[in-house]
Amino acid sequence: MATINQLVRKPRAKQVVKSNVPALAACPQKRGVCTRVYTTTPRKPNSALRKVCRVRLTNGFEVTSYIGGEGHNLQEHSVVLIRGGRVKDLPGVRYHTVRGALDCAGVNDRKQARSKYGVKRPKS
């Protein structure tokens, strides 16, 4: 235990919390341009073709972002909005694309959890 005198001379160092989403630079979302849209396979024990895209952000970072939902309209040079949130079974994927924003369309025929997939309220 440090004495009062020692603490007066040299205060305790603050612990620095490391961000899980450094490319967002303390912003809720960031805009970027797709440089590559492709599928990748998850870690064991899961098996699928997960849709992901490589995105060059407005602040210069290049990140990999997951495209949620069934089907998408993204291609190279599409402008997308990125939010934080990793995909547990895809190593290196720490961001999600926001559906229904900018060039990324919402999911077709989506009835439940619509707000997460950029879908307007259906008529009646």
UniProtKB/Swiss-Prot annotation:
Keywords noted in UniProt: Methylation, Ribonucleoprotein, Ribosomal protein, RNA-binding, rRNA-binding, tRNA-binding
GO biological process: translation
GO CC field: small ribosomal subunit
InterPro entries, per database record: NA-bd_OB-fold (IPR012340), Ribosomal_uS12 (IPR006032), Ribosomal_uS12_bac (IPR005679)
GO molecular function: rRNA binding; structural constituent of ribosome; tRNA binding
Keyword match GTP-binding: no
Domain of life: Bacteria
Xref: Gene3D superfamilies: Nucleic acid-binding proteins
Modified residues (3-methylthioaspartic acid): 89
Keyword Kinase: no
Stated family: Belongs to the universal ribosomal protein uS12 family.
PANTHER family named in the record: 30S RIBOSOMAL PROTEIN S12 FAMILY MEMBER (PTHR11652)
Subunit structure, as described in the record: Part of the 30S ribosomal subunit. Contacts proteins S8 and S17. May interact with IF1 in the 30S initiation complex.
Function: With S4 and S5 plays an important role in translational accuracy.
Entries under HAMAP family matching the protein: Ribosomal_uS12_B
Protein name (record): Small ribosomal subunit protein uS12
Gene: rpsL
